[in-house]
């Protein structure tokens, strides 16, 4: 059978797994497509490859297409986020000087309490903390700002500096940044190289944050609906496959290949299992749902998530007006997700938005298959975000 090539850009991160697995484990082939996976050196490269037609789809930071719809970042192409590729998966960490200063105060790197971590940082900092992040329009930045704004650090207590994920450990060593927020495995790489320690999982700030999305150009989605559906189904089935704990070893081995992440399988397994080593001392911490690809409708692009992102962006970018917020909330395409995954045994929620922060326990919801439950989506400060509120 002749396969249709679909070029896809991605960054070398554990949360690119649904794309890699879709190709490597035959889910793409079953849909009659072959994913041409193109590793990019930076998120701006991923954006540009998609925006200017070098690729048809991309592994993308969830706030990036929203920011583009708001006229931020200088690239005007309209993108659609047709699926969420991953939920959570980031780590917040500090370089060696901050780690040593924190330990002198008795801080034990519990890896779970955002208020305690912020209070400890406030005690030892002498000025704004420079955080390395992968891109200005990223969940990393939004989580850092949300955390700092609600704690002792304060929104003026951090400065943001862009560092490509694979270079985060080098930036710490050079003293270019004091701390970081990055996707795995690059936080664990910094720990393994003795360049820093992990302070918090991103999930400690918002415990069901949409991290990466499957993004396509809006016009491509309209002109290639059949191809889009085949791509979405292959990736969704890969995410479902990844939800089985028994496939972790296979996944780690595949992702560790030089063609993909080119780091040890053991480091990749830390993210997949949620068993993270937070310092070179060997201190280990377990985080439930550290990185989620499937359960709890993880892949569903909720319009409430896109509105939360848009409002966060508007708060820090004065050129993102209310009219642009309306356009931005249409970037997460629940309609396309529902249309194309009706053919993939997916149990999809009947609603397209939810109240972010309100789900405290596993909660059954009305769905196409009648068996769907959503996972907790709390913010650490107990804030509730209702999309219907202006």
Model feature map: region roles:
Residues 4-153, 178-188, 195-208:
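Short, glycine-/small- and polar/acidic-enriched structural segments
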Residues 41-43, 163-166:
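Short acidic loop-to-helix transition motifs that present clustered carboxylates
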Residues 307-390:
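Conserved C-terminal helix/tail region of periplasmic/extracytoplasmic solute-binding proteins
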Residues 36-38, 159-163:
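General small-molecule cofactor/ligand-binding pocket signal
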Residues 55-56, 164-198, 217, 258, ...:
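Ligand-binding pocket segment of bilobal, Venus flytrap-like solute-binding proteins
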């Amino acid at each position: 059978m002749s396969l249709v090539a679909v070029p896809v850009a991605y960054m070398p991160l554990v949360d690119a797994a649904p794309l890699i697995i879709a190709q490597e484990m035959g889910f793409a082939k079953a849909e009659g497509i072959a994913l041409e996976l193109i590793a990019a050196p930076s998120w701006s490269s991923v954006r540009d490859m998609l925006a200017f037609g070098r690729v048809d789809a991309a592994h993308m930071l969830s706030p990036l297409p929203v920011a583009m719809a708001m006229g931020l970042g200088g690239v005007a192409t309209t993108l659609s986020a047709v699926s969420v590729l991953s939920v959570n998966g980031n780590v917040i960490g500090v370089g060696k000087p901050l780690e040593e200063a924190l330990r002198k105060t008795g801080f034990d790197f519990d890896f779970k309490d955002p208020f305690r971590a912020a209070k400890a940082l406030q005690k030892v900092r002498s000025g704004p903390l420079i955080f390395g992040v992968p891109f200005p329009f990223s969940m990393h930045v939004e989580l850092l700002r949300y955390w700092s704004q609600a704690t002792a650090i304060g929104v003026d207590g951090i400065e943001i500096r862009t560092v490509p994920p694979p270079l985060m450990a080098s930036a710490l060593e050079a003293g270019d940044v004091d701390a970081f927020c990055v996707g795995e495995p690059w936080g664990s790489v910094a720990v393994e190289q003795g360049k820093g320690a992990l302070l918090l999982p991103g999930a400690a700030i918002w415990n069901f944050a949409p991290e990466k999305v499957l993004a396509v150009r809006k016009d491509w989605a309209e002109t290639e609906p059949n191809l889009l559906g085949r791509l979405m189904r292959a990736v969704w089935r890969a995410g479902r496959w990844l939800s089985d704990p028994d496939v972790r070893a296979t996944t780690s081995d595949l992702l560790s290949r030089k063609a993909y992440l080119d780091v040890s399988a053991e480091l990749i397994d830390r993210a997949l299992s949620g068993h993270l080593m937070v310092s070179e001392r060997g201190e280990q911490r377990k985080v439930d749902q550290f990185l989620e690809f499937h359960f709890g409708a993880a892949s569903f692009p909720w319009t409430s998530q896109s509105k939360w992102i848009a409002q966060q962006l508007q708060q820090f970018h004065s050129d993102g007006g209310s009219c642009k917020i309306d356009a931005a909330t249409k970037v997460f395409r629940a309609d396309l997700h529902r249309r194309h995954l009706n053919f993939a045994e997916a149990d999809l929620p009947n609603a397209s938005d939810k109240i972010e922060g309100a789900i405290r326990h596993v909660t059954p919801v009305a769905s196409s298959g009648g068996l769907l439950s959503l996972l907790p989506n709390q913010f650490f400060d107990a804030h509730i975000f209702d999309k219907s509120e202006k």
